[in-house]
Amino acid sequence: MERSLRVAVAMSGGVDSLRAAILLKEQGNDVFGVHMRHVPPSRTGRWCAGAMIREKEAFLCELGLRFGFPIAVVDLRDAFESHVIEPFMEAYLLGQTPNPCIFCNPAVKFGFLMEKARALGAERFATGHYARVSPPGPTSRRFRLLRGSDLSKDQSYFLYGLSQDQLASTLFPLGSTRKRDVSAWAGQLGIASLFPGESQEICFVPAGKYHEFLTERLDTLHAPAEGPILDLEGRELGRHKGIFAYTIGQRRGLGIASSAPLYVVGLEPAANAVRVGRVGDLDRDRLEVGRVNWVSIPAPNVPVRCRVRIRNQHAPAAAVVTPVGERSASVRFEAPQRAVTPGQSAVFYDGDVVLGGGTISK
């Protein structure tokens, strides 16, 4: 029988992290929760009322009392500001569409929060992610990151930036669990109503306030606002309200008339221009990535045949990834892919194994 471990569980306030904590406790582990206070001090008054923050933290503490484990609140607002929100805004200035979870996981959640958990005596750090970790074995000397068994909920895409040290300390109790089973568990306990439906919003931006948040933040960075909407021949078709309000593949909200549907095919920060074209102009068979992290294998020095996802809901597509220096790579797909978006991540897979990934630069 394996010995009991002292395990810290990152508690977001959702049902998945609670279920992860309960599973670990049922296995005989000494479990405690850690909740990350992350709304930056400069934003608390306007974007997330202090009362709302206190209400969420009180809710988490009540959950801990009900299910028999303590929960510590860790103030990481400054770290979240510098490691997540600032690079998030900088990416928009570059005409990119960033994913803040990609910044947060390696630096803050599995970085600062994991270190705080260790300082509180944790031997392992767990989250409610639907992903798996495979320990070193006969075929690999490294910890490997794997897709979650429930592929409809798999969250491995957001975790490719983790290090070997982080993987070695991490547990994913829901890795082999189906989301519907977690929902059924909550229903059986009569607590499903405590957890609202999953939000697709960014965690530090209130629902419906995305454009307002970006506008205020970018105003402080003196980002240019209005500019031209151009077709592929350079003709001006209209005016945009700031390139940060657009993303590759967008069709709605362009405010221009055309005999055929037009889509955003490029964002050009140097010219402060939005470029539009027909749907076929969105198809590309190659891209380049930077800030590459090879999570499950040593960094290769030869091309790698694998499958690549260019967004979380994208079906992995056959491609060849060619390393370029230490932290960059080029990707060539067997078939063109639609709406390759700079700022999003390209994540490399060999079956269920996450080989690595990086940020799409162009």
Swiss-Prot record:
It is an enzyme of class 2 (transferase). Catalyzes the 2-thiolation of uridine at the wobble position (U34) of tRNA, leading to the formation of s(2)U34. This is tRNA-specific 2-thiouridylase MnmA. Disulfide bonds join C104-C203. Belongs to the MnmA/TRMU family. Its main location: cytoplasm. It catalyses: S-sulfanyl-L-cysteinyl-[protein] + uridine(34) in tRNA + AH2 + ATP = 2-thiouridine(34) in tRNA + L-cysteinyl-[protein] + A + AMP + diphosphate + H(+). Keywords: ATP-binding, Cytoplasm, Disulfide bond, Nucleotide-binding, RNA-binding, Transferase, tRNA processing, tRNA-binding. The lineage of its organism: Bacteria, Pseudomonadati, Thermodesulfobacteriota, Syntrophobacteria, Syntrophobacterales. The active site is at C104 (nucleophile), C203 (cysteine persulfide intermediate). Signal peptide: none annotated. The record marks H129, Q344 as: Interaction with tRNA. Residues 153-155 are annotated as: Interaction with tRNA. InterPro entries: MnmA-like (IPR004506), MnmA-like_C (IPR046885), MnmA-like_central (IPR046884), MnmA-like_central_sf (IPR023382), Rossmann-like_a/b/a_fold (IPR014729). GO terms for biological process: tRNA wobble position uridine thiolation. HAMAP family: tRNA_thiouridyl_MnmA. Its EC number is 2.8.1.13. ATP binds at A10, M11, S12, G13, G14, V15, D16, S17, M36, G128. GO terms for cellular component: cytoplasm. It is found in: Cytoplasm. Coiled coil: none annotated.
